[in-house]
């Protein structure tokens, strides 16, 4: 007999335990792109009676970006998943291919889908790219005006940028007094030591190998300082995929968007 299941909106901070269980259930961490969306989305408890058995997180655009159930309810996951879709008016779903529960639920419903991002979660070797005679230094507070005027492509506030600089997570390639590029790491979640890599190259200096060398620098930096790193890029960003692969990153997974 299927138990009575209900869905109840909740303040995320009131039930962080369910999210922690979800993160532990996955073989890999998700990137900062999704973590940022989670902070701006609606959190829903999934209940059996008055017992919390899982949760869903839905963006303001009605996209499901997280779905979790306790193991003892996996046998009725398709029923609960359909209930979530109907009750929360879900129009699309972001699913990481290493999230077997959500992937299976989506495939069972024969949804249309497309691959939207390539996810890099493994390193095959120490980067072979040499960075001799390639000047890289830590960003400092007095670099803020320059960075704020140049980094239009980075979705980052002044406060977020200052935080990365203070933690020594932001690095610059400046040559002949010109900012050619920068690379940085962001801690994906406060409770886990996992770092997402970001990069920016000045449009005037692109296609000159700067991005490859910046990635080599930051990957080596993370390895030397025991900072586990992950990365991802749009499926059509072939250039970035080649750079990551050249620097030893391996992609075994993707982010899929299922559409209803």
Please identify what each model-predicted range represents.
Residues 1-29, 125-158:
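Short amphipathic alpha-helix that is part of the acyltransferase structural core
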Residues 59-63, 69-132, 258-260:
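Acyl-donor-binding surface of acyltransferase catalytic domains
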Residues 21-43, 152-174:
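Active-site rim helix/loop that mediates acceptor-substrate recognition in acyltransferases
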Residues 87-98, 222-234:
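Conserved GNAT acetyl-CoA-binding A-motif
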Residues 26-27, 171-177, 183-188, 205-221, ...:
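Recognition helices and adjacent regulatory flanks at domain boundaries
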Residues 79, 98-115, 212, 235-253:
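Conserved active-site alpha-helix within GNAT-family acetyltransferase domains
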Residues 28-86, 180-195, 200-203:
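Conserved donor-binding loop and adjoining core beta-sheet/short helix segment
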Residues 73-86, 201, 207-221, 241-246:
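Conserved acetyl-CoA-binding loop-helix of GNAT-fold acetyltransferases
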């Amino acid at each position: 007999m299927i138990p009575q299941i209900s869905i109840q909106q909740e303040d995320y901070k009131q039930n962080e335990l369910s999210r922690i269980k979800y993160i532990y259930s996955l073989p890999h961490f998700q990137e900062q792109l999704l973590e940022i969306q989670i902070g701006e989305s609606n959190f829903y408890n999934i209940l059996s009676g008055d017992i919390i058995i899982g949760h869903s997180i839905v963006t303001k655009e009605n996209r499901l970006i997280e779905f979790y159930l306790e193991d003892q309810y996996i046998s009725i996951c398709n029923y609960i998943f359909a209930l979530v879709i109907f009750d929360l008016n879900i129009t699309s779903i972001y699913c990481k291919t290493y999230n077997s529960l959500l992937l299976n639920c989506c495939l069972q419903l024969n949804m249309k889908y497309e691959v939207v991002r390539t996810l890099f979660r493994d390193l095959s070797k120490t980067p072979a790219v040499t960075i001799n005679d390639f000047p890289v230094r830590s960003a400092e507070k007095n670099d803020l005006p320059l960075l704020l005027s140049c980094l239009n492509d980075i979705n980052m506030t002044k406060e977020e940028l200052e935080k990365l600089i203070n933690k020594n997570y932001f690095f610059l390639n400046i040559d002949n007094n010109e900012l050619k590029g920068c690379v940085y790491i962001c801690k994906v979640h406060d409770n886990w030591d996992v770092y997402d890599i970001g990069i920016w190259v000045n449009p005037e200096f692109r296609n000159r190998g700067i991005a490859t060398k910046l990635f080599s620098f930051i990957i080596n930096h993370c390895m030397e300082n025991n900072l586990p790193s992950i990365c991802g890029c749009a499926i059509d960003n072939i250039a970035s995929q080649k750079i990551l692969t050249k620097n030893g990153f391996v992609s075994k997974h993707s982010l899929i968007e299922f559409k209803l």
